[in-house]
């Protein structure tokens, strides 16, 4: 009887120790990793990205680089576009045109918008939800103009995944530098 009580007591102490040590399981909620790799673009910018995000450099089109999040949804990514602009184009004129374009998306709902900086340059940032390509997505877009080029960073994800990767996306945006 004493032996059985001792075994039960030791078992209870072990279970309590494991529970008290803070062992948890993170099922279904991935822990985003910090941006550690650097992408150096021939289009005049650098940006850091996490090693578990897939980098894609399209051979043509507006997107200079696209980083896919480690989710199964191909629409979830952060991408950088670089557009040549005339010398007389300003951030405010591009902002008016860009906002008009995104407001045309189906089910557009603005969450926040305002002036900010990107790579140390005056910029504009907007966060919104909209239906794009048949998918309801949440977006953050930030853009600036420098040396006759417009740099646009777009982070987009399913609204249920958006906040999970938002801090990583913001770290990537904060790492963006124009050469």
Predicted regions and their residues:
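Conserved polar/disulfide-associated segments of primarily extracytoplasmic proteins
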Residues: 58-152, 157, 161
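N-terminal targeting sequences that direct proteins away from the cytosol to non-cytosolic compartments
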Residues: 2-75, 116, 132-136, 146-147, ...
């Amino acid at each position: 009887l004493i032996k059985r009580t001792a075994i039960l007591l030791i078992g209870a102490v072990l279970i309590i120790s494991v529970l008290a040590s803070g062992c948890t399981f993170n099922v279904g909620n991935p822990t985003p990793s910090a941006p550690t790799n650097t992408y150096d673009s021939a289009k005049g910018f650098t940006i850091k990205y996490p090693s578990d995000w897939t980098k894609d450099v399209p051979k043509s089109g507006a997107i200079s680089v696209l980083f896919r999040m480690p989710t199964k949804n191909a629409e979830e990514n952060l991408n950088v576009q670089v557009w040549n602009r005339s010398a007389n184009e300003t951030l405010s004129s591009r902002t008016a045109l860009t906002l008009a374009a995104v407001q045309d998306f189906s089910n557009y709902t603005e969450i926040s918008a305002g002036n900010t900086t990107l790579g140390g340059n005056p910029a504009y940032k907007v966060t919104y939800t909209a239906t794009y390509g048949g998918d309801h997505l949440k977006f953050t877009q930030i853009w600036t103009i420098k040396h006759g080029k417009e740099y646009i960073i777009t982070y987009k994800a399913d609204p249920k995944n958006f906040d999970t990767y938002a801090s990583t996306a913001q770290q990537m945006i904060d790492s963006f530098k124009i050469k």
